């Protein structure tokens, strides 16, 4: 479901949105609640995944960021890759939500601020048999 873009969180202290106002540390995994209302975003509990624009800002070292469901093991793939002191870099990320409506973000090295804007969400579609295709 497309929505008006809304800021889920911003870890920069000068413009903090959400519960955190400090950069992610090297090797840190950060858990973020997605469903509910944070004053900027209102994502329904029925959402199963979200479409986000994730931006890294002020990276201190070459690293990568992985975004994944909070109830899943960390995958080996990354969503953003950068070099130290690189300019702010965005990437679109579609991520499934955990059963509790959460995601995790893993920062491999150095410190980095992260900004996440939600642009849409996915929900299970209830339909009748007119749209059912039998194998």
Task: Enumerate the predicted regions with their spans.
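Short edge beta-strands and adjacent beta->alpha junctions
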Residues: 1-135
């Amino acid at each position: 479901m497309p929505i008006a873009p809304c800021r889920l969180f911003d870890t920069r202290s000068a413009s903090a949105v959400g519960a955190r106002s400090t950069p992610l540390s090297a090797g840190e995994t950060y858990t973020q609640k997605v469903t509910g209302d944070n004053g900027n975003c209102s994502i329904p509990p029925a959402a199963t995944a979200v479409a986000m624009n994730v931006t890294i800002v002020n990276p201190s070292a070459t690293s990568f960021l992985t975004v994944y469901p909070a109830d899943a093991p960390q995958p080996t793939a990354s969503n953003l890759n950068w070099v130290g002191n690189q300019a702010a870099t965005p990437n679109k990320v579609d991520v499934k939500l955990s059963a509790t409506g959460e995601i995790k973000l893993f920062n491999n090295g150095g410190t980095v601020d992260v900004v996440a804007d939600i642009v849409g969400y996915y929900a299970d579609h209830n339909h009748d048999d007119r749209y059912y295709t039998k194998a």
